[in-house]
């Protein structure tokens, strides 16, 4: 197993990142190692039990081991692997177990702390900040809806295009509705009534992703669906 050096970041990150600030429901769930959170538009997002039809964040899955669908993603990957929005590090851990050099980055102090406590190479850093590039990343991962980071899918993909090697790929897990394409101010809430500060987010389906990718200089290489999860492999446009 090969880990990349997780040099400590001195970057100051704003509290209005994914699920940050406010009542800190994401941090509470990470501390518990479990919990169902709801991601919903900030406007009119009352603090209610997690309902059907909203984006449900399964922290137990994020904090647990990679499942068979995750492992298949890594079987299609080439190293080194950069997991953007890595959370507590399940994909970094799985990549290392598969013999792929890997590094995770996340803006959540709590998530990075959990990952580092497990001995994983994870940086407290934004993808839009300084990220080690060297000769380029073999695979950049945007899983678990992380194509929504920053509320600007085209901008995020353009940044990933800068990081990926010419022979590499950006693997994106998309919204199950192929045509979905919306950016919005979101909040995360939990059943205990905790609520994050609003943050910029987006939801993108596989069809809409192709348009954002084209604007970023990327092209669709392949798509697949496993266990209700949809993935798109993007490669640098020729």
What are these model-derived regions, one by one?
Residues 199-217:
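Short alpha-helix
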Residues 167-175:
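Conserved beta-strand signature within the Rossmann-like core of class I S-adenosyl-L-methionine
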Residues 130-140:
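A short acidic, Gly/Pro-enriched loop at the edge of an enzyme's catalytic core
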Residues 148-160:
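A short, conserved alpha-helix within the catalytic core of class I
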Residues 119-129:
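Conserved SAM-binding strand-loop segment of SAM-dependent methyltransferases
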Residues 2-76:
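S-adenosyl-L-methionine
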Residues 108:
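Conserved SAM/SAH-binding beta-strand->alpha-helix loop
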Residues 78-87:
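Conserved class I S-adenosyl-L-methionine
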